[in-house]
């Protein structure tokens, strides 16, 4: 969890100053493919825990959940951020952690991934972090996609074998997620294929 560390850092750097306000917005996707939170708790419960923790560190915090869909390029999230009033000295920080590859890029009329990035840039954020896996699952050539999948997926399988006990709940969840990805890349096409990793060269 990175947010408690951020809250601690804010609290330690702002001694004897008015408490800062941290606004955290998360997306709740209605898509069935989106993996469940690793913590096994709802966003509502997570938000409550984070707000309570922030209070103990003298940091004011707002936690908001926005319903948005990857299939339309997270347009409702962008719209909400666009209409939110900004106060003086407020910084917008966007963390795109392991989510960009879920946004479709194969629609003929427009590339929703490019549209999302352009609209995000138009918001003029102070910081944007973009983290995603480096592999090519977007090829229309099935053999090329299968080769990329094989070259990439042995790593998480090997990791599970080394670090997770066979039969453990965590390993079952981990392997189910990997199996779903393999099935999605191999057996799905078009809008049904939501795993669209791209290599960093793109």
UniProtKB/Swiss-Prot annotation:
Chain residue ranges for the region called PFYRE: 92-184
UniProt subcellular location: Nucleus
Region described as Leucine repeat II (LRII): spans on this chain: 45-82
Keyword Transcription regulation attributed: yes
Domain annotation GRAS: ranges: 1-202
Classification via InterPro entries: TF_GRAS (IPR005202)
Lineage: superkingdom: Eukaryota
Keyword Nucleus in record: yes
Region annotation VHIID: where it falls in the sequence: 1-26
A GO-annotated cellular component: nucleus
Tissues in which the protein is found: Expressed in seedlings, leaves and flowers.
Region annotated SAW, chain positions: 187-202
Entry keyword set: Nucleus, Transcription, Transcription regulation
Similarity section: Belongs to the GRAS family.
Function: Probable transcription factor involved in plant development.
PANTHER family, per the entry: OSJNBA0084A10.13 PROTEIN-RELATED
The name this protein goes by in its record: Putative scarecrow-like protein 16
